[in-house]
Amino acid sequence: MRNLFKTATIYILIALVILLLVDIFSGGLSYNQFFSNLSERREVIYSELINDINDGKVTRIVLSYNNVSGQYADGTKFDNVFVPSPDKFLDQIQPAIQAKKIQIVTKEPPQVPWWLSTFLPMLIFAGLMIFVWIFMLQQTQGGGSKIMSFTKSRAKTIQDLKKKVTFADVAGADEEKEELKEVIDFLKNPRKYIELGARIPKGILLVGPPGTGKTLLAKAVAGEAGVPFFSISGSDFVEMFVGVGAARVRDLFDQAKRNAPCVVFIDEIDAVGRHRGAGLGGGHDEREQTLNQLLVEMDGFGTNEGIIVMAATNRPDILDPALLRPGRFDRQIVVNVPDAKAREEILKVHARNKPLGEDVDLSQIAKITAGFTGADLENLLNEAALLAARKGKRQINMEEVQEAVAKVLMGPEKRSRVYTEKEKKLTAYHEAGHAIVRTMIPDSEPVHEVSIIPRGYAGGYTMYLPKEDKFYASKSDMMREIVTLLGGRVAEKLVLEDVSTGAASDIKRATKIARDMVTKYGMSDKLGPMTFGTEQEEVFLGRDLALARNYSEEVAAEIDREIKSIIEEAYKKAEEILKQNIDKLHKVANALLEKEKLTGEEFRKLVFEDAQPQLV
């Protein structure tokens, strides 16, 4: 900072000297005038000067175009009196001239050299721009020696083996780790593969939803192999300057070659590897130029250099085909959402440094967190730890974990929100309707928790405990879900003889499931196993998806009738269930009004304490 201030001071002084020289050469201030300003001066206005000259008070004047200076009889000097018109001025002091009371000296204004008036302004402007440019670079990059460093790669290098990440830190991804073991072996023993003529994959693309551990897997590969790990984001290549992205790609691979064997990891590669357009506008953008350089670099080095390029994306469908061909990213590893067993292993990893109570059952937590990614599970245990700390506890109990699950899924509780008794009663019957309908349908997941405490945008919620992870949904599963979603609306109608907007989200989800059954999964008996509507990939828009209708108006009307039929059938089924179990509906709703929240065991005790309920 001190050197920066010193440099700026020098530039400012140089600029001031240049401005002073320009002023001197342009006649604004002569050398003699500059030093004569030290003597006594008198301020005179134009009209007063005319009168003083004609009265004989002025003995000498010097006329230089529109500027008059001179001396009074008492020796007082004046200068820089502006004269609007020199000819008119001479006419006005003609009496004094004729009486020879005054000495007049006429001077031509100093002429500025043509080269000075032409080139000096340009030099000053250029110098000012250079100064501003250097100043900005010093501010952003910390020194004048880094003026051209924006073409350097911004990859972060991880070489500290004491803090390395290994496969022990990556739980629930056994198949993915198995795929990467040969990559690790190649990094450790490349000669074995080279002698056999084997070619290790040059590029490995990790594909999966956000938070599934793609970046963590890449770090584990570098940690297990004990080699340098270069990490960079796809967006770091593209800058405001043309050609910077391609230069950074070249610099990144130059660094990798100097540190081989190593791993180069490009996170969110879809930012730079997006499908190239069709050349609209007669050219290509900076991102495509960067992608072209990346394609060349990946196909330009041999296996004996020991460089493994890994990348991660959650949008493999928009990547350029040239990037996915053999010889570049020729192996794709899908890192999917973990199943129940994998979730339990992930929870064990994240619970290492957390004091868990004896009542915490990680296997049960894994069951109720279907669809959670590794990042979600880590956040879940962190929220549980924060809740325990807020309560002043020294360990995390199952109560905090279950509260954290609901918080992550639907948001924090909003106990301060004020509801009228009518709204509270409506919410209680709505949630009780969901829970009872779900319980009375055969082969349904058991209820885990029912609450009328607001969370997020919801006035209440009903959670279920999945028996097992499902990778496919049958027609009966989807119908069961629609019946459950409509249970809240049916309960409102049966008991309160009115409906509310609280079921809007349920109806929207039920309608979407019914539409997918008809148009996407071919589950309609009338229309048969057909799909309706196509997804168009517009290459001109960078492979953005657009839905196109490929069926007639008659088919569209039939689709609407089928969707309506499914919804009406589910509504009647939910209505039948609740009418047969109306006493249990009242009992659960009253318990919710009293306690606000029921666990799964409390709910089942209320429902099953009498005779066996009617299953529909």
Curated annotation (Swiss-Prot):
Entry EC no(s): 3.4.24.-
The cofactors required by this protein are: Zn(2+)
Instruction: Give its localization.
Output: Cell membrane
Topology class, membrane: Multi-pass membrane protein
The record's listing under Gene3D superfamilies reads: 1.10.8.60, 3.30.720.210, P-loop containing nucleotide triphosphate hydrolases (3.40.50.300), Peptidase M41 (1.20.58.760)
Primary location class: membrane
Mind listing the GO biological process terms from this record? protein catabolic process; proteolysis
Which InterPro entries does the entry link to? AAA+_ATPase (IPR003593), AAA_lid_3 (IPR041569), ATPase_AAA_core (IPR003959), ATPase_AAA_CS (IPR003960), FtsH (IPR005936), P-loop_NTPase (IPR027417), Pept_M41_FtsH_extracell (IPR011546), Peptidase_M41 (IPR000642)
Which positions are catalytic residues?
A: 431
Annotated Gene Ontology cellular components are:
plasma membrane
Leading EC class: hydrolase
Residues recorded as binding Zn(2+), renumbered to this chain, are 430, 434, 506
Q: How many and how are cofactors bound here?
A: Binds 1 zinc ion per subunit.
Residue ranges in the Cytoplasmic topological domain are 1-8, 136-616
The reply to whether Signal figures as a keyword in the UniProt entry is no
In this entry, the parts of the chain located on the Extracellular side of the membrane are 30-114
GO MF entries = ATP binding; ATP hydrolysis activity; ATP-dependent peptidase activity; metalloendopeptidase activity; zinc ion binding
Identify the PROSITE patterns for this entry.
Answer: AAA
Instruction: Supply the alphabetized keyword list.
Output: ATP-binding, Cell membrane, Hydrolase, Membrane, Metal-binding, Metalloprotease, Nucleotide-binding, Protease, Transmembrane, Transmembrane helix, Zinc
The record lists ATP as bound by: 208-215
Membrane-crossing ranges are: 9-29, 115-135
Assembly state and interactors?
A: Homohexamer.
Family as reported in the entry's similarity comment: In the central section; belongs to the AAA ATPase family. In the C-terminal section; belongs to the peptidase M41 family.
Please explain the role this protein plays, according to its UniProt record: Acts as a processive, ATP-dependent zinc metallopeptidase for both cytoplasmic and membrane proteins. Plays a role in the quality control of integral membrane proteins.
Query: Mind telling me what this protein is named?
Result: ATP-dependent zinc metalloprotease FtsH
Q: Which gene encodes it?
A: ftsH
